[in-house]
Structures are given as C-alpha cells and as structure tokens.
C-alpha cells in the first residue's frame, strides 16, 4: 500500500510516517524543499525527511498571504495543483494523509478528484482555511484540541491529540553552571524580529542566564551569521550561548531538558510540547497568522497556567530584558494548573488504527 504524507507540522507527520513505514506501507512525502520563497537553504523538513530515506517530492504551492510576497504566492497556486496532479498520477497512492496547511490543499483536492481517499489532521486550537477546505473531501478529520471540533462536520471528527516525537523526552543538560537556561526559538524557519530583539540584549542576558537560541535556517536574513559574530565578540560569556539554525530530532531532548523556560512563537506544535513537558513560556504570537490561530494557541497555554503572552508590537518598546527578568523571578507561578482533555492512547496509534480501518473497508 502506498501512502502520501503532506502538509503542515512535519515533526508530527514524521511520527506517523515512520510508524506506517514500520508496518510495511510505502511512504511518499510531498513538502517544501525550501522554507520560504527565494530561500536558498534547504528546509529542516527536507533534511529530516530525506535523512529517514523517505522519497521527497517538492510541491511549490502558493497561499493567499496579503502581508508579504502576495504575487509570488499567488502565481504558485496553479503550480501546486499541477505538480500535485502529475505526482499523484505517477505514484498512484492508496491514501493521502494531510497535516493541513496551504501545501496540503492542492494535494488533497487533486487526490479527491482522482478518487484517492484523504484523511487530515488539524494541529491548532482553531482551524485554518486550508484544513476547512480539505475537510470537505476528507473521510476522517483528526484533531489535536477539542476546541477545533466545531469547525468540522462532527461525524468525521476524531480527537487524537498530537503525534509527538519521543526524542523530546530524552536528553541531558547542556550547561554545568547554576544559572537558569532560556530556550529561544522562532521555529524551524526562525523569527527575524525575535532574533533582532534578542541580539540587542544578549550580553546583558548572558550575565544572568544560559541561552539556547534556535535562530532559523532561512538565508533571507542570515541571522545565524550575525548570531555567530556576536558570540565571537562575547569572550568567556560565549560559553553560555548555544546558537544553531535549528536543532535536529536527536538534539531537541537535551534542549528541553536544559531549559527552565522558553521564549517562542505560539505554533500549535510548540504549545502542545510545552504543555506535555510542563515548561513555562513567554509566547510571542505571529500577528498575521490565519484566524489569529497563534494568539488563540497562546491564550490556551495561559489558561492552563504555563505562559505569558508578549505581543510582537511590544518588542519594539525596548523593555524585553526587563520582561524576561520579571518572568524569571516569578517562574514558580507558572505551573500547569489543569490538564488538556486528551485521549490516553498516543495520537499516532489512534491515527494508524483509523487509517487501517479505511483500508479494511470495501472500496
């Protein structure tokens, strides 16, 4: 049996892909070779998927994103549909497993027109436009959070939670001193505005903290070069600053093990992992995320007692260091006060069982 995996958060998708592969399914991955339009560096998604020897098919899909690169994105919309059509005709998969996002939209709809069964997974607390459209042709809709169920036909919805990479629970501490450690991340692509704010206060930050900084792999801003230049200028303090473009699966467990708290965007995957690991966080939602989903994700973590929201506009006020110090001083106030309502069974096992049920049904 052939299965195509496509769409959003590749860490979760990769968990499902690997489990399917172990069961004997032939896996094909439709994804982004580069993180952003115009980027010259290969994405973490491409590197991690190909490292698992999974065939990778690049889809140059476009999205309706009014704030930047509108015409470039718009021109890619028909390209994404055409590439999906050609690739699906060639592979002839028995199932498409979507993890949402604009790349999955053309794959799912072309698959539906070619009579290929589609299932999809929604990672966020509120559904994005792409998954709402994919849901119209999906046989089953897996959701991470109960709050997103209202966006879909109830007879299709199955609460699974989020498939988690086991590596986040495995690792060792990266620093031997008594200072608290902050993990700063804007995701695999990085967040230039967060990086810039951190660079301005980094010497002061390192007087009190160890800093683990995932600054992103995009070559458009080349923040890693600036980070390394700053690190070189820090002298002995540089020993307390660990910076990389991104942390691979084999490294992320040690990052989380070391971190006393996290400063990050509020993507669904990040928020879910922080909840499971009971890690306090300062969350900086992307202001332009679809349906304001990142702010909603952040609000959920605040309601659980683990987070404080810092809006991106506030980064420009120049008091980020003060906010970090205050958060650190009150770290004991940020503890998980209640648990998410989730199935006890791991999400990936529920998803695999539901997939195999589709294969057992008469076509």
Predicted segments with their positions:
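Active-site-proximal region of nucleotide-activated glycan assembly enzymes
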Residues: 1-2, 26, 112-170
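Conserved nucleotide-sugar phosphate-binding/catalytic loop shared by glycosyltransferases and other
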Residues: 5-6, 26-73, 311-313
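Glycosyltransferases and closely related glycan-assembly transferases
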Residues: 22, 47, 83-96, 103-119, ...
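Donor-nucleotide binding loops and adjacent catalytic segments primarily
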Residues: 35-43, 173-261, 295-298, 310-319
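An amphipathic, basic-hydrophobic alpha-helix
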Residues: 63-95
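Acidic donor-binding loop of glycosyltransferase active sites
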Residues: 94-95, 256-272
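Conserved donor-nucleotide binding/catalytic region of nucleotide-linked donor-dependent transferases
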Residues: 308, 313-343, 361-362
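C-terminal alpha-helical cap of glycosyltransferases
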Residues: 343-363
């Amino acid at each position: 049996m052939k299965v195509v995996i496509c769409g959003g958060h590749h860490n979760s998708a990769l968990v499902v892909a690997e489990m399917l592969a172990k069961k004997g399914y032939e896996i094909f991955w439709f994804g982004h070779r580069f993180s952003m339009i115009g980027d010259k560096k290969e994405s973490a998604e491409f590197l991690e998927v190909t490292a698992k020897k999974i065939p990778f098919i690049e889809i140059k899909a476009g999205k309706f994103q009014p704030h930047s690169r509108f015409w470039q994105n718009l021109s890619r919309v028909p390209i994404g549909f055409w590439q999906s059509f050609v690739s699906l005709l060639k592979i002839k998969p028995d199932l498409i497993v979507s993890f949402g996002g604009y790349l999955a939209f053309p794959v799912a709809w072309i698959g539906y027109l070619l009579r290929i069964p589609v299932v999809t997974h929604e990672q966020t607390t509120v559904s994005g436009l792409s998954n709402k459209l994919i849901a119209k042709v999906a046989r089953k809709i897996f959701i991470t959070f109960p709050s997103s169920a209202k966006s879909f036909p109830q007879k299709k919805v199955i609460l699974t939670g989020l498939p988690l990479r086991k590596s986040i629970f495995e690792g060792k501490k990266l620093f031997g001193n008594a200072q608290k450690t902050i993990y700063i991340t804007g995701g695999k692509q990085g967040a230039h505005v967060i990086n810039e704010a951190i660079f301005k206060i980094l010497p002061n930050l390192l007087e009190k903290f160890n800093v683990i900084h995932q600054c992103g792999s995009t070559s458009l801003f080349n923040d890693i070069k600036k980070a390394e230049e700053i690190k070189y200028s820090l002298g002995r303090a540089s020993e307390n600053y660990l910076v990389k473009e991104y942390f691979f699966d084999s490294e992320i467990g040690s990052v989380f093990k070391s971190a006393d708290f996290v400063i990050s965007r509020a993507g669904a995957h990040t928020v879910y992992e922080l909840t499971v690991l009971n890690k306090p966080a300062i969350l900086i939602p992307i202001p332009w995320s679809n349906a304001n989903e990142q702010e909603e994700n952040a609000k959920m973590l605040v309601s659980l007692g683990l987070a404080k929201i810092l809006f991106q506009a506030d980064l420009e006020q120049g008091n980020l260091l003060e906010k970090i110090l205050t958060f650190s001083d009150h770290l004991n106030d940020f503890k998980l006060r209640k648990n998410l309502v989730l199935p006890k069974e791991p999400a990936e096992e529920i998803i695999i069982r539901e997939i195999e049920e589709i294969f057992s049904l008469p076509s």
